[in-house]
Amino acid sequence: LHALIRDFGLPVGVLDRLIAALRWDIHREPHADAQGLAAYLEDTGAGLMWLAARALGAPDGAENAVRAYGWATATAGYLRAVPELRAKGRHPLPAGLSAQDLAQQGLAKLAQARSARRSVPRGVRPALLAGWQTKIFLDQVL
């Protein structure tokens, strides 16, 4: 990991926030509110996709598009996990936030990413492949 960070100049702060956010996965407390869940999605899915894109040479100008796509992709994955999390006694959605609301937010981020897709060089696009079914799943939630 050290060599990857060094060789590709990956932003360590993004990795630190990713690790800190993943602690939620091992605890039973729900996200405090919708902003807490949004921060979790930003620090995990958006951050991880940005790290992958940087490792493939993404310029700074691609960050917003890549992060928005990562957020949407993380949202789709999170919503897919909601039934299992509930079955395990977890409370994955904060009070006042429905799965449909979260899916709408994910679709908005996806639209944001798509409108800025020209900022993402062709050689960086493999970092985005994890999200190829994002829209399909988010639409199903609605």
Over which residues does each language-model region extend?
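Catalytic cores of Mg2+-dependent Asp-rich isoprenoid enzymes
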Residues: 1-4, 8-23, 37, 41-50, ...
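Acidic/His metal-coordination segments adjacent to aromatic residues that form catalytic metal sites
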Residues: 24-36
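Hydrophobic pocket-lining residues within nucleotide cofactor-binding pockets
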Residues: 53
